[in-house]
Amino acid sequence: MSNLWNSFEVYNKKKHSSQPGMRGGNHSNVGDTRTTVQYASERYERRGSTASESSTTSNEETPQMVDISKLSQNEFKRLYESTRKGEPNNRVNF
């Protein structure tokens, strides 16, 4: 009869590891008992790379804020297609 009530226990010791180093509750440092904190002075800026430079140039091609009421139909269509580029097709066919 005791086996039936074991499944309703809040903390079942048999479900968890017996190794004390593997108890990582509310932090991602599973092997450590404390959460590591990184202060703002310890943060380093990223180095310039070709990948980050190419992403900044691609952002310059498409304007971020555009007044849609002042665009012609062709300009709006070109802008609309450029923003949807690479977006998955989520159509559902019945």
Swiss-Prot record:
<dbReference type="InterPro" id="IPR020485">
    <property type="entry name" value="Spg4"/>
</dbReference>
<dbReference type="Pfam" id="PF17325">
    <property type="entry name" value="SPG4"/>
</dbReference>
<feature type="region of interest" description="Disordered">
    <location>
        <begin position="13"/>
        <end position="73"/>
    </location>
</feature>
<feature type="compositionally biased region" description="Low complexity">
    <location>
        <begin position="49"/>
        <end position="62"/>
    </location>
</feature>
<comment type="similarity">
    <text>Belongs to the SPG4 family.</text>
</comment>
<feature type="compositionally biased region" description="Polar residues">
    <location>
        <begin position="26"/>
        <end position="39"/>
    </location>
</feature>
<protein>
    <recommendedName>
        <fullName>Stationary phase protein 4</fullName>
    </recommendedName>
</protein>
<comment type="function">
    <text>Stationary phase-essential protein not required for growth on nonfermentable carbon sources.</text>
</comment>
